[in-house]
Amino acid sequence: MLEKVFQEITNKRKFFASSSTGEQFENQFRNELKKHFSEINGDLTEELSHIEEKPNKEIKTTFNQLKKQVLEKNHPHTLKNPFSNLTSHFLYQPFGSQNYPDFLVFIFDYVVGIEIKFSKNDKGEKNLQTSRPMWNSNLPKPNAIYVYGVANANITFFKGSDILSYETREVLLKYFDILDKDEGSLKNALKDLENPFAPYIRKAYEHKRNFLTTTRLKASFRPTTF
């Protein structure tokens, strides 16, 4: 079923690329998902409990375990679906509007996180020479699918593992873990001193590759896996 979603996006590339805002782009993808999956709304625990026919407490425990797996920074494999009856459903912003993922899709035996990335194109250029999604402080997760669009230009999609290897991700994560510890040591050293400045060390990642002219990425996701 997810294969059909991405096939439709491929067939309607111009339509999806016609979005002028990130919100519009995200809503178009959401509407496409609704054609093939049932969206779970309302109280999450109650809805899942009803679908699974299990008590709320058991549902909460199972979902919290799944959440930890979904948010794991370097989980190399597609996640197994812990729910038996959630086989064609999805959640929108399951962990909040500012948190990964934008969509959590349940497909038979698997659970897939999907994140939407969008870049503005104020000049309305049709053939952009360079275009890169913003990653801020989060590296692409290996088992996630990313849908990236540039306003009025183009759209592509890929898995996190297609653009960053497990080994490279591990090196980056370990490095920034060290920085986090160093920041803690700095704050501890300053806590008893008169100091008008609060140190704020912000990690950020910038992708060096041009996404919309990289044909390998356009064909990198093979939705038949799901």
What are these regions (language model features)?
Residues M1-S88:
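Acidic-basic catalytic patches of nuclease active cores, encompassing PD-(D/E)XK
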Residues K34, S38, F118-N121, A151:
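Hydrophobic/aromatic-lined pockets within catalytic cores
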Residues H77-G96, F221-T225:
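Short N-terminal helix-initiation segments at or just after the protein's N-terminus
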Residues T87-L104, G124-S137:
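Catalytic micro-motifs at enzyme active sites that drive phosphoryl/nucleotidyl and oxygen chemistry
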Residues Y100, V111, K141-I145:
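Extracellular structured ligand-interaction cores
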Residues F103-V105, Y110-K120:
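Conserved catalytic cores of phosphodiester-cleaving nucleases, focusing on short active-site segments
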Residues K123-G124, T130-F226:
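Acidic, metal/cofactor-coordinating or nucleic-acid-engaging core segments within structured domains
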